Amino acid sequence: MPDIDLILGADPGRRRAIRTEPTQRRSTQRLDALLDAAAELVDEIGFDRLTTQMVAERAGASIGTVYRYFPDRVAILHGLRDRCVERFRARVAARIDEIRPETWWDLIVAALDASVDLYRDEPGFGVVHGDDRELSADGGEPEFAARMANLIISEFGEPADAETLRFRLGIALELGETLVHRAFSRNPEGDARYLSEARVVVREYLATHLEHASHPKAA
């Protein structure tokens, strides 16, 4: 069974955007309401025009409540991005757990499909996800690509060059995400041509570099 904890862990060294962490259920609900409001607004008007006052009004909260959790609009956007990233990783992990992958491609498809799903049903995801990508703890590839590489290695064994795997996986996921983003920029439900091409591009790019990962390694 794949070790999905490799996908779900917190980013090392990632600073939280939230000024005050909620400690009670009511506080958590209040914070979620603020982020929900921000997500709706960025879908409607884009992140450049978002203000703290808009978020307060949409959430039915006072401006003081907003500032309790976020010092400014940029922090709100970072908070929304953090939530999108957490939900994306949770969706990827759930898909992987459900399908029980037999090849490296099954893992990649799980990530691509999770991204498509969230573009469709997670407000704010298309605007925030993919901006300001975080690097992994070693300063190398984007954090999610590094996590996926570690999962592939855990499931299918160490390749001849793990560093190159992480590098190429980062490029592949970036290419796939760009095409998925373009698909939803053209059509709210996702342009099927771009979604199909995302799979083709990613698979063809990675195929020659993941020949070792055809079958899960022996326990």
Give short role names for the model-derived ranges.
Residues A33, L41-A75:
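Helix-turn-helix
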Residues A94-E98, V128-L135:
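Short linear capping/connector segments at secondary-structure termini
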Residues S27-A38, V55, L80-V92:
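Generic hydrophobic, amphipathic alpha-helix propensity
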